[in-house]
Amino acid sequence: MDKNSVTGLALIAVIMLVWLQFMTPAQKVQPPQQVATTEQQVASASLPLPAALSPSTDTFGLFATASQGSEQVTVVENDLFRATLSSKGATLKSLVLKKHLDGHLQPFDLLGKQKNGHLSLLFLTKDGKRIDTRDLYFRNVTLETKRTISGQERYTVRYRLDVAPQKAIEIAYLFSGESYAIDYDVKLIGFGNDIAGNEYQVQWDGGLAYTEKNREEESQNALAGAYLGGSLVKLDAAKEKEVFREEQSGEATWVGVRNKYFTAALIPQSKSNGIYLEGKREAGNHFENYLAALKMSLPASATEVHNTFTMYVGPLDYNTVKAQGVGLEKIMDFGWDWLTRPFAEWMILPVFNWLNGFISNYGIIIIIFAFLVKLVTYPLSMASTKSMKKMAALQPVLQELQVKYKDNPAKMQSELSRIYREAGVNPVGGCLPTLLQMPLLFAMFYVFRSSIQLRQHGFLWAKDLSVPDSIFDFGFAIPLYGDHIAFFPILMAGTVYLQQKITPTAQPNEQMKIMLVLFPVMMLFFFNNMPAGLGLYYLMFNIFSVAQQFYINKTTTADDMPKVNLAPVASNASKKQKKGGAKK
């Protein structure tokens, strides 16, 4: 979770809790627990790079002949993308998605402008030569330079590099007509005694192209990651002029890189030895360049090593990446694993997917979802609203007690407890629905901000529900507010004001008048930079809450109001004393 997200959500939580303090009697609020953070290992950019990124040597030893040649390009097109392969390195050089456009609604190359390709094998020979297959010229065994497939069709592009007698490298790409997954097949023949450390790396080298207008926000979502031993390993190149590295041993189920809405991941079909991640943020443009590598065994006794990988290069669609069956969905940021992620994975996304089965407009889906949440929480919110109304009716009684027993706190607390019990109210009852909804609200923030389902889906004046619904851009930024005016937050702030206006309060009018204005304004400031979908959800939820409050105010009668006895209950000692006096 990035720093700005934590700060924004924490401020919203604080505002809501402060508001609850003014809407209910003062209660002791436990301080929020500090979220434990761990620093990633940072290495100075001046340190020498590891073998994965060190500069190529002038000679290639056994591979010197293969370093000379001519490049042949092969284009494979399916229902979802157009991929360009190069015989130099037998690598993937370009991938243009068909069903997704960039922030300017133009087709884009997800692999960016890196000229030498992203996918390669890397190893160190025993005579000290660093070999990156992107420096070598392969032979295209398939010969065909262009192929289009669709549906259930499959097509394989094969490359071969003959290094010496009985020594060769074979690489094959297997494409499917309707899938983002590409099988990547590797054979190393006759190199068991030539490669140092009996290990080679399969690496994805290069960050994915930024596709959104807000590059700073996209950089906050860019990272390299791996799933190792059932745990997510993340590397974020958050600072310029520093190289960030992470290297771990063990069996990994995937490594990959991502930007805000897309990912490129390598999934081994056989056991890996470990992972290596590296990242660096480019100066001045927010772009973060990443490398993610799998370490694979190459036994000295083996005459041939054959490994197959699945390469997923495509959108961060939850159902699609989860279908890979290796925990690739963990690369998607849904906030805290123990709090907001369960809401996102088990509630929000399933309901959205179900509704999307027969409703194509996500704005309508959000409205229906807000209604469903209100329906589920209706019994709780009804009980809490009635409790707050009763608390407001009790205020004159409570104030009288506070004056009467101001010098006897114990007696005052005893009488307050008695009155609450007789009136059938819970002093904290009004807080419960709001507190229960906060994890859901935070989870929706992450889903709306990072889920590709909402990307470039509009509703009313909002062109994209995953970003703020700006109706006017200033051209400069106002501190805390932003560089634009979003309209959903304005409407939402109006409903917050109206809801407070018609909700009975247990605090003095002077304090309530301040909060009546201050709370909507603060919510307006914070929601102005949040996804339009979140503003729409909160707007509709508040509208349903206002309707509920009008109904409660209209249907509540005098008989529903608490009736309490102001006379203090006599203690047991005083009762016995009275009985003893009567006998005399």
UniProtKB/Swiss-Prot annotation:
Cellular localization per UniProt: Cell inner membrane
Transmembrane segments: 6-26, 363-383, 428-448, 474-494, 514-534
GO cellular component: plasma membrane
Pfam families given in the database record: 60KD_IMP (PF02096), YidC_periplas (PF14849)
GO molecular function, one term: membrane insertase activity
Function: Required for the insertion and/or proper folding and/or complex formation of integral membrane proteins into the membrane. Involved in integration of membrane proteins that insert both dependently and independently of the Sec translocase complex, as well as at least some lipoproteins. Aids folding of multispanning membrane proteins.
Family listed: Belongs to the OXA1/ALB3/YidC family. Type 1 subfamily.
One BP term from GO: protein transport
CDD domains linked to this entry: 5TM_YidC_Alb3, EcYidC-like_peri
Species, as recorded: Chlorobium chlorochromatii (strain CaD3)
Protein's recorded name: Membrane protein insertase YidC
Membrane topology: Multi-pass membrane protein
Top-rank taxon, per record: Bacteria
UniProt keywords, alphabetically: Cell inner membrane, Cell membrane, Chaperone, Membrane, Protein transport, Transmembrane, Transmembrane helix, Transport
Assembly, per entry: Interacts with the Sec translocase complex via SecD. Specifically interacts with transmembrane segments of nascent integral membrane proteins during membrane integration.
